[in-house]
Amino acid sequence: VKSTNLMAFVATKMLERQEDLDTCTEMQVEKMKTSTKARLKTESSFAPRTWEDAIKDGELLFNGTILQAESPTMTPASVEMKGKKLPIDFAPSNIAPIGQNPIYLSPCIPNFDGNVWEATMYHHRGATLTKTMNCNCFQRTIWCHPNPSRMRLSYAFVLYCRNTKKICGYLIARQVAGIETGIRKCFRCIKSGFVMATDEISLTILQSIKSGAQLDPYWGNETPDIDKTEAYMLSLREAGP
């Protein structure tokens, strides 16, 4: 049900900005909307709701944090990548779900050598995470996508630690062929927290609370430091994979 509501929200918001979509992407989004409506009809026997209700619930679940098809509410910044300026849209109060599991609420721990900024690469299900702290809590995220005019699914997430309020990671969800598959993959990566797991026990715990995740009110509506974030993303892009 939650997945259906999320897809209803995403499809609707993207189609509100049809002028920003190319023909191929628009057709894929229309197909996604049609399949989501079919799923909604199938689910009506055990979770009756209207299309409008599904959209509202989908918006509440993630508050538009993963894919914001509306105009950004904060001033866009940009980074330099291979000689090109790329926009970064800073989503307001971009919160990832934390649930009530202690793995999320424990304090951050520096890397074994004490260098909290040493980057470590993790790969999981179509996403790459550059992790700069061994942090057991979950993150606030700021997202960007390099090609907003075509809504291509190539996203970068700057991760902030809940406890120290410092940048602790940089997540890239790679572009995939199907737009619906890509959006679902982004949802799973952020909602489940799988990409943040540093060991098998953490992975098991994070898996167990996937369906019961809730939004974390910790950050409120604080404004991110755009200059520091832009500089950090630029340094990561220059360093390469």
UniProtKB/Swiss-Prot annotation:
Subcellular location: Host cytoplasm; Host nucleus
Primary site of residence: host cell
The keyword Endoplasmic reticulum is assigned to this record: no
InterPro entries: Flu_C_NS1 (IPR005187), Flu_C_NS2 (IPR005188)
Swiss-Prot/TrEMBL keywords: Host cytoplasm, Host nucleus
GO cellular component: host cell cytoplasm; host cell nucleus
Protein's job: Suppresses the RNA silencing-based antiviral response in Drosophila cells.
Stated name of the protein: Non-structural protein 1
Lineage of origin: Viruses, Riboviria, Orthornavirae, Negarnaviricota, Polyploviricotina
